[in-house]
Amino acid sequence: MKLTDHGVFLCGGVPKQTAPLTPDEGRRRTMAYRILQAHNQSGDERQLRIRFDAMLSHDITYVGIIQQARASGMKEFPLPYALTNCHNSLCAVGGTINEDDHVFGLSAAKKYGGIYVPANQSVIHSYAREQMAACGAMILGSDSHTRYGALGTMAVGEGGPELAKQLLRHTWDAPLPEVVLVYVTGTPRRGVGPHDAAIALVKATFASSFVKNRVLEFAGPGIAKLPIDFRNGIDVMTTETTCLSSIWETDEETKRFFEVHGRPEAYKKLSPEDGAYYDRMIELDLSQLEPMIALPFHPSNAYTIRDFLANAQELLAGVEAEAKKRWPKANVHLLDKIHDGGVWADQGIIAGCAGGMFDNIDEAAQILRGGSVGSGYFSMSVYPTSVPVSLALTRLGVTESLLETGAIIKPSFCGPCFGAGDVPSNNGLSLRHTTRNFPNREGSKPGEGQFAGVCLMDARSIAATARNGGRITPADELDYTPERHPYQFDKTVYARRVYNGFGHPQPETKLIMGPNITDWPRMYELGEHLLLELAAVIHDPVTTTDELIPSGETSSYRSNPLRLAEFTLSRRVPDYVPRAKEIAAKEAERREGSNPSDILAALSRVGDAEALLNTTQFGSCVFANKPGDGSAREQAASCQKVLGGLANICYEFATKRYRSNCINWGMLPFTLDAGTPFDYAPGDLVFVPDVRKRLEKGCEDFPAEVLRQTGEKAELLLHVKGLTPDERDILLDGCLMNYYAKRG
C-alpha cells in the first residue's frame, strides 16, 4: 500500500500529477463534493450546513436523543429515522430496563412517525444497507460505523446531539473536508477477505492521521472485481482510520444489490468526473494483500498472520507488557498460547456489521465443511447480520453445515463488538471478525483482576483456525475453492415485523417510559471565569471512548444519565467518579451561597477571592493526550458533564465527533500546543480568567494559570480553535439543550 501526501488528479481513470485544471476546479469533480453540495444549505461551498436524507440510532442511543429533542420542542420526526434494537437486545442485565427502552422506542416511533426495527431483526448498519442507503444520499447515524459508501451513500457517525439537531430541523455544520483518493487495483487472492484489506488500510493510515477528518473516495479498476459484501466489509472499517466519511464508485454490482433488495430506484451510476482532484492518495493493490491479524489493543496494531506466527513470542510479550502496565491488578499471561508448534486461540467470533454478512459466513462455512471446531477449549460463534441474511443462509444449507461442525449460530446482535456477548474467559485469546479490539471492549473488568485479549481477523482465517481446533491459521494456507452463491433477500421479514410510521405521526400516542428512563439533569451556562480541578490525567497515546465510558453491561443504563455516569472512566481511572462528585458537591455549595474553603483558598492565589467567588464556575476536567478515538457515543462526554465536567484539555482530539460531543454538552474543548509540557496531577487546578468574555469575542487563545497542590503556579496557554458561531453559543449556554430552550 502506497501513500501519497500531496494532491493528484484522476484523468482517464488514472492518477496523474498534473491536469489542465486548477485544484479547486478538480475538487468540484469528485463524487464527495457533488454529494455534499447537493445537501448543503449554507450557500457557501466551503462551510457546510448539511441536511441528511435519513438517520439511524440503536437502543443505547435513541432514548437520549429523543429525550434531548423532546426537551427542545420536537413534535415529529421530519426525516426517516430508524430505531434499531441490536445492542441491549439480550435483556440480561438490570431487570426490565433493556426491554423498557425497546418499548419506549416503539411508542416514540408511533408518536413521532419513526421506523422501529425489533430486537434481533437486524444490526443497525445491515438495516441501513438493506432498506435506507441510496446512491447520492446522505445518512447520519448515532454510531461511529455509520458507513455506506460502497452503496453510493455518504454516511457520517456522530454523537446524539447532532441527530437531535436534525430532528429539530437544524443542520450538521462542518468545513468542507479534504478528499483522499483510494485507488483500487488488483484482485484478492484465495483466502483473503474484506477484513484483511480493511486492517491493512487502518495499519497504513491510523498512526500518522493520514486521513483524519477527511473523506475517502474509492475508485479504480479493482472495484469492479469485488462483490458488494467485500466492499461493504472494507467500507465499514474506514471508521478506524478516523476518516470523516466515504464514497465509492457504483457499478453493475451495486445495481444488483438494490435490485435484489427490491429497491432498484435507489441505484444510479456514480463516478468521479474526469480531472477530479484529490488532496492525498492511497494506492490499494488487492493482489498484494495477505491474511492479517490486528493484535490488542487497536485495529492498527496489525501484522500479516505469517509475520505474527513467525514472531509470536516477541509480539505477545509486547501485548503482555502493555496489559500489565495498564492493569497491574490483572495476572496477565498470553505467552502460554504458544505451544505444540503454533499459537492457539480460545474463541472465534464472526459477527456484526463487519463480519456477519452473507458472503463472509458462506465462505467460512465452505472452509469448515467436513471439519470440526473440536471438543477442546476453542469455541466458535456466528452472528448473521440480519434475519434476512440468516434466512438466506438457512435456505442455502449454510446454517446446517456450520452447526454440523460445532459452530453456534446466534441472533443478529452487536454484542461481541462491544462487550455484551461472548465475553472471553480470563486470559482468553479471542479471534473476531468485528470492528474493534480496544482495551476491555470485549467485556473484561480489569478492576476485578480480569483480562482478555482480542485479535481481529477475517472470517476466512477464523474458519481456517477453527478447522485446526484453534491453532491460528491464515486461510490462504488451506486448499479450498470458494464458490460464490447469489444472495436472495426475503422482503417479507421486515414487512411483517418492522413498524414504519414515517410521515404518519400519531401525536396522541403516549410515550411508555420505564423507571430507568429519566430526564437530563439541569446544566448551567458558562461562568465569567473557570476554575477547573483535574479529575483525571491520562498520558496514554490515545484514549478511546470505551475507556471514557465503558460499553458492555454498563450500556444498559444509558437511558439514565446519572446512573450511567457512575461508570465514567471506571476501567481506566477508578478514582475519577468519586473525585468528580466531590468537585461537583463543592460547586453546588458555591451556587447555594456557601463559601467552600477550598474554592476560596484557590481563588485567593489568583486574585480577590471574595470578588471572584460569585463569577467563577468550578468544575472537573479531564486531561488526555488524544481523547475520543472510537465510538460516536455521546455519553463519553455527557457523563463527564453530568458529573460536573466543564472541559477537556488535550494536544488534539482523536475525532471530530468526540470534539463535537464535548461542545454539544457544554464542555470546553481546550487544546495545547505540541510540545507544551503537561506534568500536572489530579487535584491540581487550572484557572481560566475571563473565559466567557473571550469566548463571546471569538478569541481562540485562553491564557490560564495552573495551581499545583504543592503551592507552585505555572502559566498555561489553552486554545479553542475553529468554533462556528453556533458552537460558541452552545458553549456559552452550557449545552445544546439550553441553547435551543433559550431560543424557544
Residue ranges and their predicted role:
Residues 1-744:
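Fe-S-dependent hydro-lyases/dehydratases of central metabolism
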